[in-house]
Amino acid sequence: SANNYGLWVALGTSTTTPLSTNQGYMIYYPEASKTYTFVGNLNNGVYSYTLTGHSGTGVYTFNLIPNPYPSSIVWNTSGNGWTKSAGIGGSCYIWNAENGNYSTIASSTGSYIPVGQALMVLVTNEASPALSVNNNARTHSSQAFYKSGNSTENKLVIRASSNNYADETVVAFAEEATEAFDLQTDGMKLFGLEEAPQLYTLSSGEKYSLNNLPLFQDQRNVDMNFETQFTGEVTLNLSLIHISEPTRPY
């Protein structure tokens, strides 16, 4: 399910085992500042990722993959440096340590993934998923951290802040969207730290961080859930992006 992430396998405080270029890693360090040294050849050419899939209906797996290149790459749709099999989602998920949550990145925005950044990809209804990237995805952006691309979607961004952490959920409206989970345009909710607020919308029994819905005429109800383990003040901010002036969220 979307709430089952498996177990992290610790490599210890140091390792001489070569790090795979088609596998992502999570680095944790308790000190205020720390310098790590990575030694190896610069990567170039096509890289294929080894992903874990599942053939069961309605079962989702998340795979952590790296940007293998010494340059930023653009997370985008198939044909723009990426080759994705049918069961791989169009959104990716990047850990945001400041918010204590995952940020959902839609492929339609052409967002930059910096050097050394790992990202989660979703696989559903596919036992043997295939994903590869080539040099066409590379870009000369000097962005040190994840940077969102431009989007022209009609969308509502809701942000919850509490306990020095935050979470966002996005509701977008498009003519081609459906009420069900759209693998290439929607994003599943990935839960973050217990100390951080968790915000998501509900549709067709699924929890969404990015929910694309059909266009509507008069009014539309969207179910939203908020969870927190923290007792204290919570701030909600709503942003309307490319939505016409008469539209008002309630």
Predicted regions: what they are:
Residues 2-240, 244, 248:
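Compositionally biased Ser/Thr/Gly- and acidic/asparagine-rich
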